[in-house]
Amino acid sequence: MPSGCRCLHLVCLLCILGAPVKPARGNDCSSLCDLAHGCCAPDGSCRCDPGWEGLHCERCVRMPGCQHGTCHQPWQCICHTGWAGKFCDKDEHICTTQSPCRNGGQCVYDGGGDYHCVCPPGFHGRDCERKAGPCEQAGSPCRNGGQCQDDQGFALNFTCRCLAGFMGARCEVNVDDCLMRPCANGATCLDGINRFSCLCPEGFTGRFCTINLDDCASRPCQRGARCRDRVHDFDCLCPSGYGGKTCELVLPVPGPAATADSPPGPTLAVLVPATGPIPHSAGAGLLRISVKEVVRRQEAGLGEPSLVAVVVFGAVTAALVLSTVLLTLRAWRRGFCPPGPCCYPAPHYAPARQDQECQVSMLPTGLPLPPDLPPEPGKTTAL
């Protein structure tokens, strides 16, 4: 071991092995470090054991949360005078220093930092902070979990703070969550407490019954047919030669051409389920029925759309002609008056000329007539 190096608690193992390190100041370290709670490091400093702290490892570590206490061993909390509790956080003189009881209540110390208040009549609570108000007098009037509030007894009346889904003065009314009709597609709404559920009809699903179930998901169509989904139903677009709901039927092969003696008409073939291979012989296993079909050919003439167009055009033309005739008669209407001026004042008739014919005015009411022109010899003025 190199001279001048002192090994403590096997910390200086490097010295024993003869490693080229700077010798530690063993004498100085041992004189300052509390070797019962730590050890000397190679650099001469103290390394404390768990639960101890300080420059020389001379101070124990208190229990976490300890407020007014100390320790003799690690993780202890020994309370100072006047404090109590596990963490030394309760004042033993709370009744004299803080006076926690309110509204005239008397504080009684129970030891260990605890106390209780002796409340005067009409008050209650840990610190006599609550008054026997409307809530207490009514005996918890709020229903369905509602909270009664009366400003700690000082309010004249109580109010109920209702839980979600209830309403009313005392929370007695269950809110109808189906009032807005949230369920779609004819579903039945079932009201609950602050919730609802939809009883969906067949073919729909989802919280609001808005999802149409895919009836083609099970691939019901046969023969490679394409499936088209519907509401609680499906359609199969069968390939040529097949029919039925799921294309399970094989359509018959057309029979031989009709003979000359056969009556004209279509041939109706009964569909046969495709339970086996189709016979190769023509018409084998098929029943053909000839049906006479009488076709009455429509006489040549106007179709319904053309006939409607002609009627409408004729009605409009007649209306225009009638309006023109009425306006013409009104404009050229003549009146016969007794001798003298016309029997009707302007602007309807102008003064009579010679044979007392009245002049018709087409001007609006209130407009002056044009000045009278002298009639030509042998002519009568009329408009």
UniProtKB/Swiss-Prot annotation:
Residues 364-383 are annotated as: Disordered. CDD domains: EGF_CA (cd00054). One of its GO terms (cellular component) is membrane. Residues 27-58, 62-89, 91-129, 131-172, 174-210, 212-248 form the EGF-like domain. It is a single-pass type I membrane protein. Residues 1-26 form the signal peptide. Pfam families: EGF, EGF_DL_JAG, hEGF. Its main location: membrane. Residues 27-306 are extracellular. Residues 328-383 are cytoplasmic. Keywords: Calcium, Disulfide bond, EGF-like domain, Glycoprotein, Membrane, Repeat, Signal, Transmembrane, Transmembrane helix. Residues 367-377 have a biased composition (Pro residues). The keyword Transmembrane applies. It is found in: Membrane. Regulates adipogenesis. This is Protein delta homolog 2. It comes from Bos taurus (Bovine). The gene is DLK2.
